[in-house]
């Protein structure tokens, strides 16, 4: 049995994206609207996606622009807070993606109980934010050190924007 069938329940899963708005620490964060607004937008998307019949959902900091390869702690803390607030409403398997930090993605998955992650885990790239070495050896060791072996890894083979 494939991990998709095991974790999500089907071999051809529809994994929908729940793109998080800019959060504390991001240049585009709206402090007047605050995290309550970010969480409300996520809630609305989550409910719409689940009601639409998707098999799974993945939370990503899509609006943490410009992206970084070593994400600040405030980003992961904000994502964990938001996902924690929504956890009781999540009725389908879920994953996370902290753009573009493989270690922090695993940290978030472990902290919030995600079933899987998606990240760029292989290769070296030139991008709009400079040279980027994914250093999967470090990520694999980190995964072991935080006991996240049960978290499934989805590899992006070629990152968009490179």
Over which residues does each language-model region extend?
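Glycine-rich, proline-tolerant flexible connector loops at the mouths of alpha/beta enzymes
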Residues: 53-78, 124-129
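Alpha-helix N-cap and loop-to-helix initiation/capping positions
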Residues: 30-41, 70-78, 130-134
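Alpha-helix-loop-beta-strand connector modules within alpha/beta enzyme cores
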Residues: 3, 10-11, 16-17, 68-96, ...
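Conserved, mostly hydrophobic/aromatic
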Residues: 16, 49, 57, 117
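A short, N-terminal amphipathic alpha-helix
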Residues: 41-53, 85-88
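Ligand-binding beta-strand-loop-alpha-helix segment within the catalytic cores
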Residues: 86-87, 93-96, 100, 108, ...
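Active-site mouth loops of central-metabolism enzymes
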Residues: 19-44, 94-101, 157-162
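Conserved anion-binding
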Residues: 20-23, 104, 108-162
